[in-house]
Amino acid sequence: MSDPAKVRRHAERVRELVASVVRSQIKDPRLGMITITDARITADLRDATVFYTVLGDTAAQSGTAAALESAKGMLRSTVGKALGLRHSPTLTFVLDDVQDQVKHIDDLLAQARHADAEVQRLAARAEYAGEAQPYRVEEEPGDSEDETPPSSQDQR
């Protein structure tokens, strides 16, 4: 097993190398507006996964995927020479769906804001369910207006 810091360093180097080679050396017309977002490499440094995003529709994404697959050998040899490892890591390219996730989260946040606004609107018009004083109050015998205390003249 390799040191995790070493693995992380090699993964970052793979990302930088693939991005620079894609930008400067690959002249495939199918290659769209691509951004290399991340790279991960296994602990034995033999397999690397490169994540990328493409600006455009699904046709641009599929064309870019085909261009990366056709340039995989050249990219692997360039990465292997630059890293100086005994074995060049195999490269796997994965379309990163970060943009779709961001759009989905934005939609969920918009729905939550709308629901909060609806709750606030309903709360502003809300009234108490029942009387203003919901509890029974026991009347004391002296507080009643109907009952008058017996006067001294009535008792004779």
Curated annotation (Swiss-Prot):
- Cystine residue pairs: none
A Pfam family per the record: RBFA
- GO molecular function annotation: ribosomal small subunit binding
Question: Where does the UniProt annotation locate this protein?
Answer: Cytoplasm
Identify the main location.
cytoplasm
* Superkingdom of this protein's organism: Bacteria
Q: Which UniProt keywords apply?
A: Cytoplasm, Ribosome biogenesis
One of the record's GO cellular component terms: cytosol
Cytoplasm in keyword set: yes
Q: Does the keyword Membrane apply?
A: no
Could you provide one GO biological process annotation from this protein's UniProt record? maturation of SSU-rRNA
Residues of the region (Disordered) are 129-156
Regarding protein family, the annotation reads: Belongs to the RbfA family.
What functional role does this protein have?
Answer: One of several proteins that assist in the late maturation steps of the functional core of the 30S ribosomal subunit. Associates with free 30S ribosomal subunits (but not with 30S subunits that are part of 70S ribosomes or polysomes). Required for efficient processing of 16S rRNA. May interact with the 5'-terminal helix region of 16S rRNA.
Q: What HAMAP family does this protein's entry cite?
A: RbfA (MF_00003)
> How is the quaternary structure described?
Monomer. Binds 30S ribosomal subunits, but not 50S ribosomal subunits or 70S ribosomes.
Q: What is this protein called?
A: Ribosome-binding factor A
